[in-house]
A protein has these predicted regions:
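Loop/turn elements at helix/coil->beta-strand transitions in domains of secreted/extracellular proteins
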Residues: 23-25, 75-82, 106-112, 150-153, ...
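Active-site-adjacent mobile loop/cap segments within catalytic or ligand-binding domains
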Residues: 25-28, 112-114, 118, 160-222
């Protein structure tokens, strides 16, 4: 995708926010990894095994499907939001963070959420923040609780040693963004039962709905 077209897509998303009355927060949505262009996945790795039925999940496709749903639901609820990566190419972490920080410089309402599918042979969902106690921790707890409520069938992976359920990691998008930032790992794409949920359109709707319910609660804290 040409640079001019990317700028138009970003501006279109920004203009969409301007038309609506301002919400208390503006959600910057990061759909991690690349999408699929002409049948070719744009990111090395970041995919499930090929399952016995022949299907294979590409994480970047899943992430975009969830982020697109979340954005539409937020639009319907009048909550400002911006998809940081409208293109299908695999945009670098540095560029993603730069786009987010530029938005925050001009609009201090911004909060950041990166959506992913997990890997490593486990099961369940988890929410990450940067190390230490920050405002992100409160947001992560809200995301965690909504996912736990929506998905009782999924293992709620948590670390309560510091008093809250989020896990901490030095992920680039968490430590280099200026605003409160969380990263959601929805379920494991390399575990068959979890991956079936990641494929499911019904469960994709549930993942998105839980995120939006959490954002509505975060909005009320501003």
């Amino acid at each position: 995708m040409k640079k001019g077209m990317i700028t138009k897509l970003l501006n279109k998303s920004k203009n969409k926010c301007k038309i609506m009355a301002k919400s208390k927060c503006k959600v910057l949505l990061d759909n991690g990894h690349g999408g699929i262009i002409n049948g070719i996945y744009q990111t090395a790795g970041k995919r499930s095994p090929v399952w016995p039925d022949g299907r294979q999940l590409f994480e970047g496709e899943f992430n975009r499907a969830i982020v697109n749903r979340v954005s539409k639901l937020l639009d319907n609820k009048g909550i400002d939001n911006l998809i940081l990566v409208p293109e299908l190419t695999d945009v670098s972490l540095g560029t993603r963070v730069s786009r987010a920080n530029k938005e925050y410089i001009h609009d201090k309402r911004c909060i950041f959420l990166s959506v992913h599918a997990n890997a490593g042979g486990g099961t369940g969902f988890e929410v990450f923040t940067s190390p230490g106690e920050t405002k992100s921790d409160k947001h992560a707890t809200i995301y965690f609780n909504e996912y736990k409520k929506e998905f009782p069938e999924l293992r709620a992976r948590q670390d309560i040693t510091d008093g809250d359920p989020d896990k901490e990691a030095n992920y680039y998008v968490l430590v280099h963004t200026y605003m409160p930032a969380c990263l959601m790992e929805c379920a494991f794409m390399d575990t068959l039962q979890n991956c079936k949920m990641l494929f499911s359109e019904t469960d994709r709707d549930r993942f998105a709905s839980a995120i939006v319910t959490a954002i509505e609660k975060i909005e009320k804290t501003y």
